[in-house]
Each structure stands twice: as structure tokens, then as C-alpha cells.
């Protein structure tokens, strides 16, 4: 009977065949231990010399790392294993023998591993990170579908940009200039006027020359837009969404979190409502903490965000940033028109901003004024202005960076490990 490592628990004391790769092995004169993986998990295969044909044991000792195999044997309980079971191997069939696999069990430098990213993905920890990424995506769809959102797919090639063109990749669209999208927001706002609540999930591109552990050139973003929704209501949706995702990973990725040695007690504390601190109060807090490199009207850097998040040791909303450091489409704060109705959600443990969101300007005259103030081409935004001409309503939206969120939840140090094939300032291969 053919099965998988994940399903093998349903076949205790039965003989099964599993297609797998050999990740590692060790042997003595009488027994060989094969570390097997098949994409669904990792399992140990035990080959006892006295219980198999001589050729099988010889093969078990000689087979090379990352060779592909069909392994047949009996599934037995093993309380020492993370899985709780292992295979007593009876026969081995080699599908393809691997020669001189470059990523050996010894330590390798990061650049070497990134050069071999197509192979590094096979390692136990990288496999665990990708499984957590997959669970975050699954939980995202679950949350939005249950909450009545409609999925919309905005274009990747665009003629205009929600935040200006200075950090966009320019390309040719036949005889026109086009940009790789940095956000689907403007299109989602249009879709929200048709469907009420919408979300998207797709790649975004930022031509930022950043080399920090938080930045990728290409990353995936989950964006939501909600009609008839105010800023406070939007924050509630955001914190409910993040809490749902964290709980889903805790429930469905226990083994992966253990492999990554993640301190799950920090994740277990994540619950609504999240703390909120205004930009004004955050400035005062930072100055009291000894930060003399930040003044009102300046954006926060990584050390500032980390200090604020560490104070709460939870995801925290920083609200109502100054108008002059935020994009043109954000609604003024009626209590202080030098600020806007926006919030950044800062993850704890130094992972930085994972969500940016705001209430959107819904008044046509004000939006036209903002477009001019930011030096944007009004014609390029004519469709966006139309949304305020024909039945404008209060509405809000937000975007969550998938890779940063996965980095925080999984506890990995650098965001590059949370994308299958990350695009960095100095890396376009593989």
C-alpha cells in the first residue's frame, strides 16, 4: 500500500510503501537509520541487518544524500520521535541516485545557501517555515471568506501608483510606460464600491534599496478594503484577522514551530484588543526612553518601532501619523488635521510593521486637492476620483505583508527565509 509520511500514522503495524528522499543517514555494523522526507513530513526508517536481505542493508549504508527512493516497511510506534512513529524498513528501491549533493549536514554560510536556495528549501527548518507560510495563507482565506469578503485580483501592471512612483519598477507596455504594482489598493477601493468588502492576495514590488532583515524587493501582500467602515471598525477587523491567523498556526503547525524552536508562549498571548498608541504619545514615549534622534513629523525607524513593541510585548497599533509623511489618500483626523486616520500594526520582538491601513478620503474636492499637493497626474487617477463622484461612502483598507508576518510567527531572524525564492537588493537568482 502506497502512502505518505503524514498519513503513515493511520497504518500502524501495517506494511506500506513511501516515495521519499534521503536527507541523512547513519549506520553501525548491525543497524542503519535513514532520515526520510516526502514533502508531507520527515520520518526515520530503521534497517536492521539481521531482518533484511544482505543487498538491502548494503544499499542502506551506501545510498547517497538526496537520492530518491521507494521505501517499503512496517510502521511502528516510536515515542522518541516527533511524529510518534517510524518505519521498520524491509526493502529499498532507488529511483534516482544523487551525486555530490552540495548542501551537506555541515554548516554553510548564508550566501552559499541562498545561491542554492532551490536545494536549501529541502532542509527541515526551511520546510517548516514554508508550511507555516502555507497555513497563514490558508487561514487568511478562511477568515475573509467567513466574514463575507469577496476576493478580487487587481492588476500587476499599472499606469498609476497609490504612493507615487519613486519606488516603482518601470517597464514598457508596448508604446506606454507601466509600473509593477506596489499595491492593489486603488483597484480594491473600486471593487469595494461594487462588493462592499473585498480582499486580494498577490505579489507587490518595491524598488527600495534596502538591505535590512525586514525588506524584500518582491513580497506578497494581503489587502482588504471595506465600504461603510470607519477607522475604529477597520482596526477591529485587522486585529481579529491577525489573531485568527496566529491561532491557526498554533493549532495546525505545532511540529513546525517545535522544529524552529519557536517560543510559542509569546504567540499564545496574542488576543484582541491590541494595544493602541497615538503617534504623538509614541514620540513622547521614545523621548522618555532616551531616543533623541526622532522629532514630531518624522517617520519611525526600526529601533523606534522595536522599542514601542517591546514595551507592550504584543502587536501594537501606532495611530494617527502626521499628514505630511503619509500618502495622499488618507482621511484627515477630525480631532487634529495635521494627522490622518491611519495605523501601522507593529509586531513584537523586533519584526516591525506588518500592517499599514487607513480610512480613505471620501470627499472629491479634498482628494483632488491632495492629488495636486502631491504633484500627481490627475488624469492618471481619473478613475480613482470617479469613485468619489458616484456614490462615495466612508471606507477603509489595509495591507498585511505576508513575509514579515511569517517571519514573526515562525521566529526566523531574516525575512528572506519566509519566501521560497526571495528577491533581494543583490539577488535575482535562483
Swiss-Prot record:
<keyword id="KW-0030">Aminoacyl-tRNA synthetase</keyword>
<keyword id="KW-0648">Protein biosynthesis</keyword>
<keyword id="KW-0547">Nucleotide-binding</keyword>
<dbReference type="GO" id="GO:0140096">
    <property type="term" value="F:catalytic activity, acting on a protein"/>
</dbReference>
<dbReference type="GO" id="GO:0005524">
    <property type="term" value="F:ATP binding"/>
</dbReference>
<dbReference type="Pfam" id="PF01336">
    <property type="entry name" value="tRNA_anti-codon"/>
</dbReference>
<comment type="similarity">
    <text>Belongs to the class-II aminoacyl-tRNA synthetase family.</text>
</comment>
<dbReference type="InterPro" id="IPR012340">
    <property type="entry name" value="NA-bd_OB-fold"/>
</dbReference>
<dbReference type="GO" id="GO:0004816">
    <property type="term" value="F:asparagine-tRNA ligase activity"/>
</dbReference>
<dbReference type="GO" id="GO:0005737">
    <property type="term" value="C:cytoplasm"/>
</dbReference>
<dbReference type="InterPro" id="IPR004364">
    <property type="entry name" value="Aa-tRNA-synt_II"/>
</dbReference>
<dbReference type="InterPro" id="IPR004522">
    <property type="entry name" value="Asn-tRNA-ligase"/>
</dbReference>
<dbReference type="Pfam" id="PF00152">
    <property type="entry name" value="tRNA-synt_2"/>
</dbReference>
<dbReference type="GO" id="GO:0006421">
    <property type="term" value="P:asparaginyl-tRNA aminoacylation"/>
</dbReference>
<protein>
    <recommendedName>
        <fullName>Asparagine--tRNA ligase</fullName>
        <ecNumber>6.1.1.22</ecNumber>
    </recommendedName>
</protein>
<keyword id="KW-0067">ATP-binding</keyword>
<dbReference type="GO" id="GO:0003676">
    <property type="term" value="F:nucleic acid binding"/>
</dbReference>
<dbReference type="GO" id="GO:0016740">
    <property type="term" value="F:transferase activity"/>
</dbReference>
<comment type="subunit">
    <text>Homodimer.</text>
</comment>
<dbReference type="InterPro" id="IPR004365">
    <property type="entry name" value="NA-bd_OB_tRNA"/>
</dbReference>
<dbReference type="InterPro" id="IPR006195">
    <property type="entry name" value="aa-tRNA-synth_II"/>
</dbReference>
<dbReference type="InterPro" id="IPR002312">
    <property type="entry name" value="Asp/Asn-tRNA-synth_IIb"/>
</dbReference>
<keyword id="KW-0963">Cytoplasm</keyword>
<keyword id="KW-0436">Ligase</keyword>
<dbReference type="InterPro" id="IPR045864">
    <property type="entry name" value="aa-tRNA-synth_II/BPL/LPL"/>
</dbReference>
